[in-house]
């Protein structure tokens, strides 16, 4: 629905339709701002996709972040909302090429702000791959992992999304030997504070008694559960 008059300066998906307010309050009619349209349509894609696979999408931050992924990929720009403000054409809604949001320090409990963390990870994945289309292939396939969780569980859900991304990128059913774009994905997500938890074991030989303050070098063996061994091979 376009040209709604019961509000201004916003647009929304209500579970059944996407809606855009008319020009008012110093804001353009958002139905003519392309990335806003893509963003709201992205909400519909996410919700209908999860519903079609038998579950209900629940996480607001991920929903906002995913909608931004669609918008910045289709417009091929990290800047969202150019043109929505009639009085200040330089005012924007969000951008992803500066001031990145990082988990957990930038998690504030506001879905649009927190969504910048996960969208930023996907945006940086595309930059690392030098390919929006390549990133979107992984992103689209990763949706089948159905990463989900209530608001407030973003730390767990973001990590699940990273794992889903690697599984989507995997081409031989063996994460232990890495994936074609493993470094691009892992480094992008890590830049935004999203990392996988590893099972780490240390082993070392018995240590002899040595005088205090005396250097005593010894060898330590570090075992890391795959796929983390791939990331540190040769280190």
Residue ranges of predicted features:
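Extracellular protease catalytic domains of secreted zymogens
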Residues: 1-209
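Buried hydrophobic-core signal for structured, non-transmembrane domains
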Residues: 39, 220-222
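Short, solvent-exposed loop/linker segments at the N-terminal edge
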Residues: 207-218, 230-231
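Extracellular acidic, Ser/Thr/Pro-rich low-complexity tracts
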Residues: 222-230
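Alpha-glucan (starch/glycogen) binding determinants
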Residues: 235
């Amino acid at each position: 629905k376009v040209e709604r008059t019961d509000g201004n300066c916003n647009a929304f998906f209500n579970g059944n339709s996407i809606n855009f307010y008319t020009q008012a309050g110093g804001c353009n009619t958002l139905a003519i701002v392309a990335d806003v349209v893509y963003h709201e349509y992205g909400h519909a894609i996410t919700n209908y996709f999860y519903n079609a696979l038998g579950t209900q999408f629940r996480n607001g931050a991920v929903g906002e972040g995913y909608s931004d992924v669609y918008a910045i990929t289709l417009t091929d720009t990290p800047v969202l909302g150019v043109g929505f403000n009639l009085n200040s054409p330089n005012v924007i809604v969000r951008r992803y090429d500066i001031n990145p949001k990082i988990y957990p320090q930038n998690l504030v409990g506001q879905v649009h702000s927190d969504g910048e963390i996960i969208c930023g990870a996907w945006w940086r994945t595309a930059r690392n791959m030098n390919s929006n289309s390549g990133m979107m292939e992984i992103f689209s396939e990763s949706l089948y992992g159905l990463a989900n969780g209530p608001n407030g569980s973003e730390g767990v859900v973001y990590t699940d999304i990273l794992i889903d991304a690697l599984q989507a990128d995997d081409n031989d059913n063996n994460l232990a030997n890495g994936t074609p774009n493993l470094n691009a994905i892992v480094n992008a997500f890590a830049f935004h504070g999203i990392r996988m938890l590893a099972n780490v074991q240390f082993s070392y030989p018995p240590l002899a008694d040595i005088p205090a303050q005396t250097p005593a070098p010894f060898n330590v063996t570090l075992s890391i559960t795959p796929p983390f061994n791939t990331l540190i091979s040769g280190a």
